[in-house]
A protein has these predicted regions:
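Conserved N-terminal alpha-helix of the aminotransferase class I/II PLP-enzyme fold
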Residues: 43-91, 113-118, 124
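Conserved PLP-anchoring active-site segment centered on the Schiff-base-forming lysine
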Residues: 101-119, 148
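Conserved C-terminal alpha-helix-loop-beta "cap" of PLP-dependent enzymes
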Residues: 104-106, 298-371
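PLP-dependent aminotransferase-class I/II
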Residues: 129-167, 171-174, 181-188
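Active-site C-terminal subdomain of aminotransferase-like
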Residues: 138, 165-166, 172, 180, ...
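Catalytic PLP-binding core of fold-type I/II PLP enzymes
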Residues: 181-213
């Protein structure tokens, strides 16, 4: 472990911190990891429960007692006692399955041009026969005015039956850029969709980090109340794998179970997801994991700002986007992993740093010492 303290009170302490960090990294050849939040296995409490239950014999496909208990805990947290809760294996499978289940054959899905389903899911939605209908992105978010205009303009066109109909609105919380929709923004989008008979679907791959943000003025119950369907991400928030789809009204997703299987998203060993989500929703672990990651992300952000680096997006969650001179980027790459956000620029590049349950205070301090 790196025992490095980051102090801003004197130039001397900063210098000593930096020199010791570089010496430690050089002698141990240890890399610091900030590339994403699902590169390690699983939170120790989840691993412990998986090991403790490993030799138990239970029924498959999520019909076991652990999955039922996890569903009950999720319904309670969502204040939605009658909700459908279905576990799926991963985020792309979840999005493709839910969107296919919600849409008629002639419909497409409205989403920001930067949306994960439009950019980083290899055409999974299109593979099911549905088009992604893109809207302008504002730091990852869609605007209520753009959503309203798109739907209204579609039906105002005399030839609308010859075009792909907007069948649902897809948003993410937090967005691809780590930004979050406020409660008011969610309420307005929900009203627009429901007044036009269009379901609102929220991708919650990193939902825990949105809930843990200091800027969050909404709860999980608010999400369940305002969205027709959403999912609680496990893969990126401490679980080894798995996502939990929630539909407040089960009639919104009729025949969902066989559709999950058709899309290759149903696990025979469903208990594995039940154990994980039951653990995540016991003693507030889900939010505690996210709070830890967000706190360290904010510490990273403050260090970048104090060193004079430009913050590309005002993200209050565990993803931070920073503009780095290319020479700085290349120097840091020798000691840490992170992702280029887009194409490398001629002189400077936007870089993404991500924290998780596995990120330690020492990791962050060591990286700060390199700046």
């Amino acid at each position: 472990m790196f025992i490095v303290q980051y102090r801003q009170n004197t130039e001397q302490s900063n210098y000593l911190c930096t020199q010791r960090t570089r010496r430690l990294l050089t002698t141990t050849n240890t890399m610091l990891h900030f590339d994403t939040d699902y590169m390690e296995g699983a939170h120790p409490k989840i691993m412990q429960r998986l090991m403790e239950t490993n030799l138990e014999h239970t029924v498959g496909y999520g019909s076991d007692e652990y999955s039922e208990s996890a569903r009950a805990k999720i319904r309670e947290a969502c204040n939605a006692p009658d909700a459908l809760v279905q576990f799926l294996v991963g985020g792309t499978q979840t999005n493709a399955t839910v969107i296919d289940a919600l849409l008629h054959r002639h419909e497409g899905v409205l989403a920001a041009e930067t949306a994960h389903i439009n950019v980083h899911e290899s055409g999974a939605v299109e593979h099911s026969g549905h088009k992604v209908l893109t809207l302008p992105s504002y730091d990852g978010k869609v605007s209520a005015d753009d959503v309203r205009k798109y739907i209204d303009d579609y039906y105002a066109d005399e030839t609308y039956e010859h075009m792909v109909a907007p069948g649902i609105l897809y948003i993410t919380q937090p967005t691809e850029y780590g930004t979050i929709y406020s409660l008011h923004e969610l309420e307005v989008l929900s009203d627009i969709c429901h007044s036009r008979n269009i379901p609102l679907y929220l991708d919650g791959a990193r939902l825990g980090y949105a809930l843990a943000s200091d800027e969050a003025d909404f709860t999980l119950a608010d999400i369940a109340r305002l969205c027709d369907v959403f999912y609680i991400g496990g893969t990126k928030v401490g679980a080894m794998f798995g996502e939990a789809v929630v539909a407040r009204d089960p009639k919104t997703l009729p025949h969902f179970f066989p559709l999950v299987k058709q899309h290759g998203a149903l696990m025979a060993k469903g208990r594995m997801q039940g154990v994980q989500f039951k653990t995540l929703f016991t003693d507030n672990l889900y939010v505690d994991i996210a709070k830890h990651a967000v706190r360290l992300a904010m510490k990273l952000r403050e260090a970048f700002v104090s060193k004079g680096y430009k913050i590309a997006v005002n993200s209050p969650t565990n993803q931070q986007f920073v503009v780095l001179p290319n020479e700085t980027l290349d120097r840091l790459k020798a000691h840490a992993t992170f992702e280029l956000w887009g194409i490398r620029g001629e002189h400077e590049t936007t870089v993404r740093f991500v924290t998780s349950w596995a990120t330690s205070e020492e990791d962050v301090d060591a990286f700060i010492g390199l700046l």
